[in-house]
Amino acid sequence: MFLQINRTSELARVFGIDFFSVLSRGSQYRVESMLLRLAHTQNYLAISPGSQQVASQPAMECQPLVMEPESGFYADPVVVLDFQSLYPSMIIAYNLCFSTCLGKVAPSKANTLGVSSFSPDPSVLKRVKNEILLTPNGVMYVSSKVRKGIMPRLLEEILSTRIMVKQALKRLFPSQKILHRIFNARQLALKLIANVTYGYTAAGFSGRMPCAELADSIVQCGRSTLEKAISFVNAHDKWKAKVIYGDTDSLFVLLKGRTVKESFQIGNEIASAITAMNPNPATLKMEKVSHPCFILTKKRYVGYSYESPEQSEPVFDAKGIETVRRDTCGAVSKTLENSLRLFFEHQNISELKAYLQRQWTRILSGRVSLQDFVFAKEVRLGTYCTRSSSSLPPAAIVATKAMRADPRAEPRYAERIPYVVIHGEPGACLIDMVVDPLELLAMDSPFRLNDLYYINKQIIPALQRVFGLVGADLNRWFIELPRPIREAFAKRPFSAPNAQRTRIDYYCLSKHCTLG
């Protein structure tokens, strides 16, 4: 609790807003607090558009570059390079701001700029024609020699201050824990405000002062910078490198036949060369080397990563797959991570097949922990566009069942509700097979964990998306697996406290045939 108060206090000091507003207000309020204070010192006043003006401004047209990756398994090192604070760097480097924008080269018929009417003065354009920067989306800006923009000035101060705070953080002694927490919260606040400044210009729905042309200029300058970097790396004969994936501000560069140490050396050379190509402060940083790794699709990859050439033991690094996602159960994430580690270390399909068949045998035999098979998904009752309970998500169905038994069991908004999938009647839908884990654990429970659902619908699809890239057919492996004999259920005592013996199926040990 004290740490949260300390962090919030530092955020309030940096943003220049009150304590409660840090918790209750959004990022636009924070940006505007700092932006307007600086604008007033330069004799600027901000416009205050109405909702109709915001809704009627032109739509944004530019998107960041996200390449379609070359999906596959890479046994050779893949260098990951990242532009530090790409969008703030573009704002500073090209002096992009509300106060420096001269409008489009080919103005629209409505003569608008963002949310307001604007027509550039021909005499002004003629006077500063040698100091005009034309961005890739066709919008003109004056250079910093003519006028230094408010946003570039703000971001320069934020980034330089953050560097000083981080340097001071490194000089602290281990015993200075309170100062360490204060400085860390302060540099985090500066990082947050720098990263959301672009979003302030691009908030086209509920924006306080959006400008589509300015937002497009920032995105398009960043996209152009990344495209030039990709072309430069692919065309350089010395490195013999190939960019296999690019995402907004990062590059994945394949170096065939190189060691991890050589990859770090080449990666640093690439970073230095591309940094020298771009205006200050745009900086490409060598982030890590992945060796080996899988690249699945956009924003989904996994591998063993090294952050320095001296690092001996790699770190398991995953993004976008089931090992780091919260919408699956522990059995899926653990099986996938263990399978990946096994394959990365031995790169042997036969060993992987043997491991997975052992895991499937354990699941079919019931020798598993129920905790690994519990889903926990968010429930937002009152937001589902359906009148029938049969169309609700499984977690919402479990929540409504609990509410029928006890109205006080209504979940909070976006609360995660646990549930498991059990065996049902032949042809039963998923919504008829979800129950609270406590119902499955009850002494007189007739339910049994639906092992085939977890294997066929959860584990195999997650693993097939990854290992299908190396030719593995997990469905065939499962079909080839001899089915184990499940141990018989313990006999239910007839002296159980449950007196509701109104149906014959109460006396059955299970609704599922153990011979089937």
Locations of the language-model features?
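Non-transmembrane amphipathic alpha-helical segments
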Residues: 155-172, 190
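Flexible hinge/switch segments at interdomain interfaces of large molecular machines
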Residues: 134, 197-208, 245
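DNA-dependent DNA polymerase catalytic subunits
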Residues: 13-122, 126-136, 146, 154, ...
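Gly-rich Lys/Arg/Thr-decorated short loops/hinges at beta-loop-alpha junctions or inter-strand turns
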Residues: 202-220
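Catalytic P-loop NTP-binding/switch module of NTPases
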Residues: 141-150
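Conserved glycine-bearing catalytic or ligand-binding loops at nucleotide- and phosphate-handling centers
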Residues: 9
